Amino acid sequence: MNTFGQLFRLSSFGESHGRGIGGVLDGCPPGLTVDLELIRKELSRRRPGQSALSTNRNEADEVELISGIFEGKTTGAPIAFLVRNTDMRSQDYDYLKGIFRPSHADYTYHSKYGIRDHRGGGRSSARETIARVVAGAFAKMLLNTMNISIEAFTSQIGPIALEQQDSTLFSSELAAENPLHCPDREKAEAMMALIARVKEEQDSIGGVVSCVVRGLPVGWGEPVFGKLHARLASAILSIPACKGFEYGSGFDVSQKGSQQNDAFYFDGERINTRSNHSGGIQGGISNGQPVYFRAAFKPIASIRIPQETVDKEGAAVKIQIQGRHDPCALPRVLPVVEAMAALVLADACLMAKSKERIV
């Protein structure tokens, strides 16, 4: 499927070496002031060629807003947009036309469709995430009107991880000091050095993104099959190279129930919890506490080290991947994680509004 969401719905299109990447966003409420600077900022964070930590493919990534906006505000009509591709080197991929790259989508796409665009991965390329980031910026505009914030940061690269695992305690100011958006100066330096070394070795490395959502009201999310954490997991795991997701205390099963349970108390204004092991979600519905989750991204599959594989006839071949590739999904994936979280929450917002009690 190329469409995500129920009421706040994105349909995306485009390939890595096609004419462009774009989308149609349907369900965005009318009257929302369009923040063009926010869209540019989010695209810039995702844009290739911005630092030594990323690919040197150089794209301007300027968005054309085609419909759904009048006099600086959304009209309620579908918002169509396009970001044109300008720096493609398709010839770098000609030798791969009949070869399946290890751990890429080449084999599965070919097996499923009988045809595939071999240029830069085609539709399976992470360049597709441009559409998510643009749509996510509109979702953020909606959430900003309710003082809801979303912030992702780097919490691990390879074996180097933050010691503080409580995502809600990190410093935005410290994170803003480095390209990785890591809230620990020492760890950030070590992480960047590791990525640089891996890049020099023509290899790649994986990492973990932590994300915090603040300001959510109580009551967003649906019971049973539409649980908020399940929809977040679906959204985040749809991002290329994402291999794992946990929210709240997640896989930390060493504690007993008496330690994990979040005790309720009344703070004089509203019901609160003394801890937040639940990650801001209980029964699939937001409880008013910060929502936090972590997502693991595998090492980028495109590496220049020689590898063994087969062609579409099954003959064994040895390849050395050319082209321009990131040594690590982080930090460029951070705005994509935020965008997907924003799309889920904007959709949850509209669903909650549609079910507000009238008696």
Go through each PLM region and give its residues.
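Glycine-rich, N-terminal phosphate-binding loop and its surrounding beta-alpha-beta segment
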Residues: L43-P102, D106
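Internal helix-turn-beta structural module
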Residues: R9, I300-V359
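N-terminal, positively charged regions that mediate nucleic acid binding
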Residues: M1-R57
